[in-house]
Design a protein with these regions (language model features):
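Hydrophobic/aromatic-enriched cytosolic interaction surfaces used to assemble or bind macromolecules
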Residues: 1-258
Length: 258
């Protein structure tokens, strides 16, 4: 049982998470600025999809291009020294199925130690590039890695970071600046989340007194998740606690708050 949550804040969140973005999920878009966010399901898009999205784009961002952040499928992290671009599909398909109509985008982590092989929907890549040639196309896990690595490299104990989103959660385990483990797991309730979380902890033989567990952000919609972990782990902390309240949680709330 934690005696009380500790809150920590490395640098500033806006150094790592864009303040204006279009977040692409399997079932829709989330348009985000610090003042407002709106989730638009694909099933609600009108017949004139292009015209509607261009109008929504201008309403939120004017002539300033946002970042396009892809959440549809998990990315694969490959050590820079071992990476060969011609083998990116082989790397990825050994990790996860490459869905039809998706292509692989290769990015660098900020510390230049890893290549991030990330699937993006070809349709939306082409669409947004037509809207603005210089638009940034990013995978959300690359952004998360950069943020949590910047924090963990200053710590002496192992750090396990948890990012919660609709239908899934991400884990990153660091020892100092070095990534030891990462993965994304499906979840739709607290029990499933706790099962996978503690399966990983046991598989990696992590002594609870030897690592700190961080949630990214702290949101009312996930209180049951925090409570569930606090019953089993003593070093529970939160990074970038957001004071904004919203009765309807965003699909990935950590990316919709600054």
């Amino acid at each position: 049982m934690v005696t009380g949550p500790r809150f920590s804040m490395p640098a500033t969140k806006s150094q790592f998470i864009p303040q204006k973005s279009i977040q692409v999920f399997l079932d829709g878009f989330c348009f985000y600025t610090p003042q407002h966010w709106e989730f638009i399901p694909f099933k609600n898009l009108p017949t004139d999809t292009q015209g509607f999205l261009e109008e929504t784009f201008k309403k939120y961002f004017g002539n300033q291009p946002p970042s396009i952040i892809h959440f549809e499928h998990p990315a694969l992290f490959v050590p820079q020294a071992l990476f060969e671009n011609s083998k990116k599909e082989d790397y990825y398909t050994h990790y996860n199925t490459l869905a039809e109509a998706f292509e692989l985008n290769v990015l660098d982590t900020e510390d230049k130690t890893l290549k991030v092989v990330a699937p993006i929907a070809s349709k939306w890549k082409s669409f947004f590039k037509k809207m603005h040639a210089n638009i940034d196309i990013i995978n959300y896990q690359n952004l998360l890695y950069n943020l949590v690595q910047s924090h963990s490299k200053t710590q002496t104990s192992k750090q396990l970071f948890v990012h919660l989103q609709n239908g899934a959660f991400d884990l990153f385990l660091f020892d100092g600046a070095n990534l030891l483990f990462n993965n994304r797991f499906a979840q739709n309730n607290v029990d499933t989340f706790l099962y996978f979380l503690f399966y990983v902890v046991e598989t990696l033989k992590l002594d609870q007194d030897a690592f700190d567990l961080y949630f990214l952000g702290k949101y009312d919609s996930y209180n049951a998740y925090y409570d569930g972990v606090s019953n089993f782990h003593n070093n529970l902390q939160y990074l970038f606690v957001d004071d904004q309240k919203n009765t309807t949680p965003a699909p990935a709330p950590f990316f919709c708050s600054h």
